[in-house]
Amino acid sequence: MGGLGNQLFQIYTTIALSIEKKTGFIFPRNKLGMDKRSCMYWTSFLKELNKNATMKDIKNLTYTVYKEKEFKYDKIQISSDLIRKTGGALLYGYFQSYRYFDNEYKTISQYIKLDESRQLVRRAYYKKYENRNVISAHFRMGDYKYIQNCHPIIGNEYYINSIKFILSSINNSINGRNFKQQEVEQQEVKQQETKKWTFLYFCEDEDFSEIKNRIELIKSGLRLDSETDIDCILNMEFERGGNDTKQKMEDWQQLLLMSCCDHNIIANSSYSWWAAYFNNNNDKIVCYPDKWFGPQLSNHDTKDLCPSTWNKIKS
């Protein structure tokens, strides 16, 4: 089923379809990677789904098989009658579009107790940021370094453009209020303007040294840009997410920590996609790169990957 981000797409799609068809749902235990160290979330973050895991060999099941036809959203066409006749349906694919499950998002999130997990992470790791404006940024490198024809590494320009976009959007939002709104919300606006900004970046341990150097280049690029709010940039703090904790954060905890931030700059990664999607801040600004796949996967249509409220930024 892949890593956490890929699994979440498959999980949410499966449960959403079961709600639509008014059936139960199961996950094959041998496909969940429950015994792997990298999949600790099945005993923590996703532990509620253990009761829906089965030891049955899916090869011996007589269920209707539905295979994803292409990368873009394509409504899953399986009739309830066919599901009843064959005893169930097997889904094969990535299903990487919010449209597969967006209508059932709240119900599914309640089922896996998402809010409880987010609150635990927030209390443990986010306290120091409560009085700041926080932008999370995910840098995806790792195995991408060896498969850039499929998954390109997003360059510094994207992160510079995204920070500029977020800051200008905030300023335009404040300046665009009418007189009555400004009067009623004066205190709120004042607090927004005086809050310090924190750029909280996330990466794998093996990439930290390289990302640390890239952060310095990003800071320099912002300072040299004539369109940047220089005072804001000079006062912006750049920190590695979860780096100051005594205990190493699991990957699912880092994902949820990103979701607690005010705004999100995601990489071309299903992992940080979910961090932004889980963010329940009504005023969040989400930036995603215009290049999601490399030339070898240029046939993958990503038009339905991200919600329309998110912002495609040049990378």
Pin down the residues of each PLM region.
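A short, glycine/small-residue-rich beta-strand->loop->alpha-helix junction that serves as a flexible
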Residues: M1-F9
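Donor-binding and catalytic core of enzymes assembling or modifying cell-surface/extracellular glycoconjugates
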Residues: L4, W197-L297
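Short catalytic/ligand-binding loop motif for oxyanion handling, primarily in non-cytosolic enzymes
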Residues: N6, G33-M40, Y100, Y144-I147, ...
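A short beta-strand-loop structural module common to alpha/beta enzyme folds
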Residues: T23-G33
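Leloir-type glycosyltransferase catalytic cores
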Residues: P295-S315
